[in-house]
């Protein structure tokens, strides 16, 4: 599902926020079936810390190598059924656990943006959180970008090509299609950051 609106998929994703591990980064190399990743977990760890701190990710640190701990806010509460199941699992198994998902939802304090506050547990998530508790571009990064005075918001635009300069060996801009007029525009910038939904862009 593509989001043809300001905020895109940041308004409709499930907010589950997990770190990749070296199990993920080394799988191609160990299995010998594909190209090895050029990075490892240690390269991304400080950026995971930064993003989790900025957007507000709640969750529980559990000390599992395949499920890396992070810079989490207090976890959301389990419901009564989940709580009972968690107790049953811990009684019967010493090598298994049940934990709440790690979600980009503020459970304590506030985060930068347009009046973001904590989750009120009112089940309004699917209509867009009126409290700004769950992370979205509209409640966090767009207001922050607007405050810089250097942002131009251009809705109704689909990036169809990243402009690559072979001499500089870097992206120098994007080519977009206006969804209303079908005109093509180019935007140049020293830095290009892509934020996209993987299935729609693969």
Task: Label every model-predicted segment.
Residues 148, 157, 161-165, 174-202:
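Glycine-rich loop(s) and the adjacent beta-strand/alpha-helix scaffold that form part
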Residues 4-15:
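Conserved phosphate/anionic-ligand binding catalytic regions in large, soluble enzymes, centered on
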Residues 14-19, 28-159:
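Conserved redox-cofactor binding core of oxidoreductases
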Residues 113-114, 165-172:
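A short, glycine/Asx- and small/polar-enriched loop/turn
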């Amino acid at each position: 599902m593509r989001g043809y609106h300001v905020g895109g998929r940041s308004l409709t994703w499930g907010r589950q926020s997990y770190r990749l591990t070296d199990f993920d980064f080394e799988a191609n190399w160990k299995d010998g079936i594909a190209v090895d990743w050029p990075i490892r977990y240690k390269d991304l760890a400080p950026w995971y810390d930064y993003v989790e701190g900025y957007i507000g990710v709640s969750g529980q640190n559990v000390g599992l190598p395949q499920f890396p701990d992070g810079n989490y806010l207090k976890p959301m509460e389990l419901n009564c059924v989940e709580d009972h199941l968690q107790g049953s699992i811990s009684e019967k198994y010493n090598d298994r656990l049940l934990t709440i998902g790690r979600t980009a939802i503020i459970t304590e304090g506030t985060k930068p943006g347009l009046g973001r506050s904590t989750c009120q547990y009112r089940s309004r998530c699917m209509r867009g959180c009126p409290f700004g508790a769950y992370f979205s571009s509209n409640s966090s990064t767009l207001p922050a970008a607007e405050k810089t005075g250097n942002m131009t918001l251009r809705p109704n635009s689909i990036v169809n090509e990243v402009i690559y300069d072979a001499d500089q060996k870097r992206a120098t801009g994007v080519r977009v299609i206006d969804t209303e007029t079908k005109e093509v525009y180019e935007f140049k910038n020293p830095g290009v950051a892509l934020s996209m939904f993987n299935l729609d862009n693969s």
